[in-house]
Amino acid sequence: MANPKVHVRKGDLVQVITGKDAGKKGKIIEVIPAKNRVVVEKVNIVKRHSKPSKTNPQGGIIEKEAPIDASNVMIFCPKCDRPVRSGHKFLENGDKARICRKCGDVLDKDK
């Protein structure tokens, strides 16, 4: 079975809409399509106990971001200043870009 498609990409600015971190905004660090999960910067922080190793000689308790379900985040439109649903549109140069459904602004930074 093919991996399900996730509506957000690495580097997108998103807002968490449900759960303990609802309302927080952050950038997507990692997308895990096989599990339909995303890792968002400074959201869903967990504490992990790590043994001393070469990379971390001190060891101890480390705080890091844990994955959350992709359905719990929405793309944040800076022009509307709110989380929005995204649509797709072909631009004049022939590229396909994601757009804000509210204001029509292009959400892809590179397009």
From Swiss-Prot:
Part of the 50S ribosomal subunit. This is Large ribosomal subunit protein uL24. Transmembrane segments: none annotated. GO terms for molecular function: rRNA binding; structural constituent of ribosome. SUPFAM superfamilies: Translation proteins SH3-like domain. GO terms for cellular component: ribonucleoprotein complex; ribosome. One of its GO terms (biological process) is translation. Keywords: Ribonucleoprotein, Ribosomal protein, RNA-binding, rRNA-binding. Pfam families: KOW, ribosomal_L24. One of two assembly initiator proteins, it binds directly to the 5'-end of the 23S rRNA, where it nucleates assembly of the 50S subunit. One of the proteins that surrounds the polypeptide exit tunnel on the outside of the subunit. Belongs to the universal ribosomal protein uL24 family. The keyword NAD does not apply. It comes from the Bacteria. The keyword Ribonucleoprotein applies. NCBIfam families: rplX_bact.
